[in-house]
């Protein structure tokens, strides 16, 4: 499974690791992903999403039903 947030679409990005002498070597910045289980009252079931910390905050603000509608509108499964 890829390291992508299902709500925000955050994914790993690349950059440089810098030593004290400012030598550059490539590195990856990974999103802060968590598997989180939500109860969907309308469907009477749990769903598990792979979310970044920001994605969890968005669901706290908008509600799980509204966020799932946005995911469906993009044509994605959850």
Swiss-Prot record:
Keyword terms? Ribonucleoprotein, Ribosomal protein
InterPro entries listed in its UniProt record:
Ribosomal_bL28, Ribosomal_bL28/bL31-like_sf, Ribosomal_bL28_bact-type, Ribosomal_bL28_sf
* Molecular function (Gene Ontology), one example: structural constituent of ribosome
Q: Look up keyword Ribosomal protein and say if it applies.
A: yes
Q: Which Gene Ontology cellular component annotation is one that this UniProt entry carries?
A: cytosolic large ribosomal subunit
Which Gene Ontology terms describe the biological processes this protein takes part in? translation
| Signal peptide annotation | none
User: Which regions span the lipid bilayer?
Assistant: none
**Family recorded in the similarity comment:** Belongs to the bacterial ribosomal protein bL28 family.
Tell me the protein's name.
Answer: Large ribosomal subunit protein bL28
Question: By which gene is this protein encoded?
Answer: rpmB
